[in-house]
From Swiss-Prot:
InterPro entries: PLAC_motif_containing. It comes from Danio rerio. Belongs to the cornifelin family. PANTHER family: DUF614 FAMILY PROTEIN-RELATED (PTHR15907). GO terms for cellular component: cornified envelope. The lineage of its organism: Eukaryota, Metazoa, Chordata, Craniata, Vertebrata. This is Cornifelin homolog.
Length: 112
């Protein structure tokens, strides 16, 4: 008995996933909002970077790779559906990495 493939009688439908775009819970320059995060970011930023990466489900070695903090910020922005672009992420993590890292840590803390 030869194999007969089932024929399709209708086209697959496109599914649209909608979500609400949100905003950062704190501004980039709000470093004084959380004293613990600010001190950790100022004196041991590598530890804060590792914590942010691990809380995002990434390797703790991620912050030590060139350009990885931009990707980490983009990943967190995508996870929480925060409005912005990769260019915004690059500018913040390149020009003001301390403030950007502290903002990421505050965002994770605020969203649990």
């Amino acid at each position: 008995m030869p194999y007969q493939a089932e024929s399709m009688t209708s086209q697959p439908q496109m599914t649209v996933t909608s979500y609400t775009v949100s905003h950062w819970s704190s501004d980039v320059c709000d470093c004084c909002d959380d004293c613990g995060i600010r001190l950790c970011g100022a004196f041991i930023p590598c530890i804060l970077g590792c914590k942010v990466a691990q809380d995002n489900g990434d390797s703790c070695c991620l912050p030590f790779l060139p350009g990885a903090m931009v990707a980490l910020r983009t990943s967190i922005r995508d996870r929480y559906h925060i409005n912005g672009s990769v260019c915004d992420d690059w500018v913040i993590m390149t020009c003001c990495s301390f403030c950007g890292l502290c903002q990421l840590a505050r965002e994770q803390k605020a969203r649990g």
